[in-house]
Amino acid sequence: MKKIAVLTSGGDSPGMNAAVRAVTRTAIYNNIEVYGVYQGYQGLLDDDIHKLELGSVGDTIQRGGTFLFSARCPQFKEEDVRKKAIENLRKRGIEGLVVIGGDGSYRGAQRISEECKEIQTIGIPGTIDNDINGTDFTIGFDTALNTIIESVDKIRDTASSHARTFIVEVMGRDCGDLALWAGLSVGAETIVLPEVNTDIKDVAEKIEQGIKRGKKHSIVMVAEGCMSGQECADELTKYINIDTRVSVLGHIQRGGSPSGADRVLASRLGGYAVELLKQGETAKGVGIRNNQLTSTPFDEIFAESDRKFNSQMYELAKELSI
């Protein structure tokens, strides 16, 4: 293994830069040349590939976003398009590709490994949604969680001052981990998740019970994958006469300097990805399970159609929100 490339793809997440830094410095330490692919898979097509040096990743571990940039590239699903991307790697003698991103990014890496046996591919889970199989946590999840906690703590101040119910919508299309972990952390009165069939009438009854006990305000945490915050508010007011406000946190969840936990996770996974390439591994995603570094074949990651839902944590959140 003499040359590798690294790219970031899909939605950005805090800690991607730390992962690129770890890949780059681990490779250089092992006398491997590193190339950065700018603009994700689109950069592979456009030949936007440039050599990275130690200085290229200096002063990046604390930066949010990705200095390699990211872009959606739906045309990468086409075989002719992928051939062009593979040729751009081949002509530089690149033997390994590290892809940092989510499920769609992994699928692109798998295609490359299938269609070009001389190019090894390793995926690193980078998404705030924490929805990738093969790992307990994805890069960016912890930072996004802390961003939500900080925001909702401030929202609760104004909710308390005006005796209002705030519906807070957070990211999470298919996986409600952000809503679940944040809801437990901020003491939300109710958490609405895509993994759980929630009757809004029950939510209204719970809020009403709290009002009867003297509670003046409530926080309802909603993952975007099951309904919008506004839809939740509209449904609630059909059953109970309360003053509601909706707060959609949106892309603020993706930004900001990565937390210490995300910097460490990204560094560990980035270094491990290079080690796997050195060992001749390919078509695998790296991860962390029980604080141990692991690797899982892409086929197995895709076969697990549903991540294991933490029902125990959900039940605890319900018990603590009485």
Swiss-Prot record:
It is found in: Cytoplasm. One of its GO terms (biological process) is canonical glycolysis. Its main location: cytoplasm. Coiled coil: none annotated. ADP binds at residues 21-25, 156, 187-189, 213, 215-217. GO terms for cellular component: 6-phosphofructokinase complex. ATP binds at residues 11, 72-73, 102-105. Its cofactor is Mg(2+). Pfam families: PFK. The keyword Lipoprotein does not apply. Belongs to the phosphofructokinase type A (PFKA) family. ATP-dependent PFK group I subfamily. Prokaryotic clade 'B1' sub-subfamily. Catalyzes the phosphorylation of D-fructose 6-phosphate to fructose 1,6-bisphosphate by ATP, the first committing step of glycolysis. Homotetramer. NCBIfam families: PFKA_ATP, PRK03202.1. This is ATP-dependent 6-phosphofructokinase. The lineage of its organism: Bacteria, Bacillati, Bacillota, Bacilli, Bacillales.
